[in-house]
Amino acid sequence: MKFRKLLIIPAICGMVFVSCEKDNDTNNAEVADTNEVTTGSLETLGDNTDLTPTNLDQATLDLIASKHLSPIGAQEELRYLPDGTSEKAIRIEGDIVMTKAELEELEFNGYSNENAQYSTNALVSPQTITIIGYTGGSQALTSSEQTALQWAVANYNRLNLNINFSLTFGTNYQNKDMVVYNNTVNNPSGAGGSAGFPSGGNPHKFVQIYGLSNYNTNVIEHVITHEIGHSVGFRHTDYFSRQSCGQNTNEGTAGVGANHIPGTPTGYDSTSIMLACFSSGEDGEFNSNDITALNYLY
């Protein structure tokens, strides 16, 4: 799969929206996304749906397009939850996984045709976000994944934003704002993650990672940080080209706009944590543009 997932605000370094991330065994990386990545293999944060014929009806494809997301290769699939239950969902742009109802709730606020470093109005209200790392059954986070989640949360909290995270580990996820879990059992091929965009001032709840057992903790930290980014409203930094994945495809403005974030580049940012694809050489840290964007929005 080729997801890297992030939200309707193009890339932390530039946009907010939700999506997924995956690793591709090529010299280009994608997170639900980089031509300039030369270390290790490249992965996207989700399935390579852009290369797969869609299984959706025209009305649903039109709905996706109305949100300024790309309907190319969009797929209906089951989203498996940590307790083993599942629900119908739609995978868009490789690593954005949302139910049809969630998709319908996304608001359109206009958009820009500029390149990267943008934001939308789909943000999380100032709050403490309760986040749980799932530890039960076949979808439990491994020890390395738990450590990576701790590092990812620490990266966000040390910025002193008007959102912060309160992290616990366990199985009682129903009353938490966000749950991070290992869904490799239902994603046996590929490596990466997936998530969705915020709604109603709240973050997207479900953050999946999978196929990361052969990666070091820094790479896992990168994927988790990326997917959390989608969940609080960031879109892929290279949404306008998916260049990190070796592609030249515009993902669209994802319904909530694409407003340039002051102080960040308008072109390709090769080290942003919100690139669509990732490689085995990631360090899991925000770059300076990611931090600028986070501080501007939150």
Per-region residue spans from a language model:
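The catalytic-center signature of Zn2+-dependent metalloproteases
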Residues: 218, 223-286
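Bacterial signal peptide processing site
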Residues: 21-24
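Catalytic zinc-binding patch centered on the HExxH motif and its immediate surroundings
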Residues: 145, 173-204
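Active-site scaffold of zinc-dependent metalloenzymes
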Residues: 192-217, 273-276, 293-295
